[in-house]
Amino acid sequence: MTLEVTDLVGGYSQIPVLKQVSFTVAKGQLVGLIGLNGAGKSTTINHIIGLLRPQKGSIKINGVSLSEDSKRYKQSIAYVPESPILYEELTLKEHIDLTIMAYNLDEKQAWQRAQKLLTIFRLDKKLDWFPANFSKGMKQKVMIVCAFLTDADLFIIDEPFLGLDPLAIRDLLALIAQRKAQGAAILMSTHVLDTAQNYCDKFVLLNEGQVTASGSLAELQAKYGNSQATLADLYLQMIERN
């Protein structure tokens, strides 16, 4: 199992936001992390990427926790945040160089991969641009390029469809499918439930910091007794029950 979250209790203070959260993401699997605003999705992600430390429970990637081997743990993750995080003083080219250095990638091979990604997202003529020159959608594309030029075992993608044009959404979904086929594990937080239903293998439904249900669409339909329900139907049913 690539990602294992076990009995995670945590948050931003001594009062836990997350309460015994457990789920897994296997190799070659895309898991949708679903929940209302304030349900605990961002807090869960911040624990996985190491910005927050668990109060109780554990998080492991390929059997290794952050405290056991921080370098190996962090280099196993590629993260695309909801709000792009770029260095204002660095050009697009320098952001790619920084990513190559941080992940200890072969420079020639990484740049070959980067050039393909830059072309896909129509950024190949903008290598000398600074973040101030980019729109929010273009900044999001920079984050996607930097994440997908790595060899990460786990991709964490937070609300990827906000700010992206339809063409970029199509291209991102194609990249996700490609990396899945190559064996990567992918955790995606999203409010776009129809897209999640069409692409995710499994779902983790969060409500008030707890996992209320998890499984494939068929498993969730069986749990809630509605074999024809969409993911949106099931999610609304879960909210009403709780």
Task: Give residue spans per PLM region.
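Conserved ABC ATPase "signature" region
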Residues: D97, M101, K108-K126
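Conserved ABC transporter NBD signature motif
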Residues: G57-E68, R72-Y73
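Helix-to-loop junction immediately C-terminal to a conserved catalytic motif
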Residues: I49
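ABC ATPase "signature
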Residues: S214-G215
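Conserved ABC ATPase signature
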Residues: F130-F134
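Catalytic Walker B motif of ABC-type/P-loop ATPase nucleotide-binding domains
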Residues: F155-E159
